[in-house]
Amino acid sequence: MADLTLAYHTCIEICNNPNVGYSQTYRAGQTVGGITYYDCSSLMSYCCTAGGFLASNPWFTTRSMDGYLIGAGFQKSTANQPWKKGDILWRSGHTEMVYNPADGGGYT
């Protein structure tokens, strides 16, 4: 069963890890020189998979993520609705997860 709280906390743990970095070249969670890399969409893909929304990680991109997330049960909302922690925000070229600072010291 999918668990948004698990996906959310996985994202926070990764963002707080000093051995995680940003790379589009190594975006599929590859570890190079002791640093594990993601880009914005591959991090969302990893966290959604960890949370049980996806059976295996497709390493989606911002261009392809819409279909994967809708298929996993996520729903689109309008920009004027209040954001909740764990909501995934998307625009052309970037995605991120809404973060509540009371839940830890990192950013998503």
Language model feature labels by segment:
Residues 1-57, 92-94:
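N-terminal capping segments
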Residues 60-61, 77, 107:
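Intrinsically disordered/low-complexity terminal segments and short unstructured peptides
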Residues 62-66:
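Membrane-embedded alpha-helical bundles of multi-pass integral membrane proteins
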Residues 71-80:
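Short alpha-helix capping/helix-loop boundary micro-motifs
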Residues 85-87:
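Loop/turn positions that initiate beta-strands
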Residues 89-92, 101:
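A short, compositionally biased micro-patch
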Residues 97-108:
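Catalytic Cys-His active-site segments of thiol-dependent hydrolases/isopeptidases
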